[in-house]
Amino acid sequence: WSDCRFLFRLRNEDEVRKNSFQTSEIPYSSHENWFAQKLQDVNTVIYILERNGQAIGQVRADRQERTAEISYALCREARGRGLSRWMLSELENRLREDGFCSELYAEVKSENIASQKIFQSLGYREKIEEYGFSYTKHIPLFSILMCTYHSSATLRNALDSVRHQTRQNWELVILDNGSK
């Protein structure tokens, strides 16, 4: 239960509470129940970031259908080093590899400028909300990559070959090297 205790301490840090939508301190017994439920929930993934054997952050995704809501936090000593951006990028990669979801979603308070910048830098779509901002990002589960050679016939063949694709959550990437 060391992860449970770490997450409890992290969740109740002043800065984490300030950026959370639930700002009150959480009693350990409530947190312990929440943690036990999350561990059993197939729609939740939690990753603990460690450095030199010490837990320094967490990132979580809670899935509803094909969309997963992101929550993340770093302990005070780990902030300002680019780890949040790295942690969210790694989460995207793992969720894509596991086929966990096809879209990510996050809510950020208007005063949480650092998180806003992170989601913007990772290519999330930003929407203004009453509380601040919401961020969404489509993460295709696989890509179909086709090369064309500056030829409309090659491009047409590439499009025809995937037109009747029946798998969900895919994208077509067409590369054109410009040769004639």
Question: What label would you give each PLM region?
Answer:
Residues 2-4, 10-13, 50-144, 148-149, ...:
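Acyl-donor (CoA/ACP) binding surface of acyl/acetyltransferases
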Residues 15-34:
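Conserved GNAT-fold acetyl-CoA-binding loop/helix
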Residues 36-48, 57:
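A short helix-loop-beta-strand connector motif used in the catalytic cores of GNAT acetyltransferases and
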Residues 104, 172-174:
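Hydrophobic/aromatic residues located in beta-strands of well-ordered beta-sheets
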Residues 143, 169-171:
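Structural signature of beta-strand start/N-cap positions in the alpha/beta core
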Residues 151-154, 179:
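Donor nucleotide-sugar binding loop of glycosyltransferases
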Residues 160-169:
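Short, acidic, metal-binding catalytic loop of nucleotide-sugar glycosyltransferases
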Residues 161, 176-180:
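A conserved acidic beta->alpha catalytic loop
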